[in-house]
Structure formats: structure tokens, C-alpha cells
């Protein structure tokens, strides 16, 4: 699985699924799919964001950048 994060602060693209709790991190099932989505948004998005594989370390970093505990992070596939 892959996520797209803002290069400056590593905050991932998220989706608001409910009124309370943290937003869910949007995931893609393959790097090419995530890159295609990013490129479809234009050059500014490509310059500002990067595609990262979801690993224990990257998930911990994304949770930290969102200000939540790693165990509170929810992943949701794109499109949802």
C-alpha cells in the first residue's frame, strides 16, 4: 500500500469519514496508481507531494505529523 504525503511536513492525504476522531489516511494499492493520481492534479501537486510506501516507520511518521497515536490511524483505499 502507498500513501501521498506533503513533502514539507509529511502530513498524508486524508479523508474525513466521521465527525469525531482523526481523518483516515487515503491509500492506493500500487505506487503507479498513487503517482497517476498525483500527476492528474498537476505540476504543483507533484512538486509539493510525494508517494511513500506504508511501512511501520512511515505509518508512525504520518501519525506523528497528524498529531495522533499510531494505533488510532485508519487507512481507507482510494477511491472510497
Per-segment meaning from a language model:
Residues 3-5, 28, 34, 51, ...:
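Hydrophobic beta-strand residues in large extracellular and virion-surface proteins
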Residues 20-37:
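Extended catalytic/binding region for NAD+/ADP-ribose chemistry, centered on the ART fold
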Residues 39-80:
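Short, mixed-charge low-complexity intrinsically disordered segments
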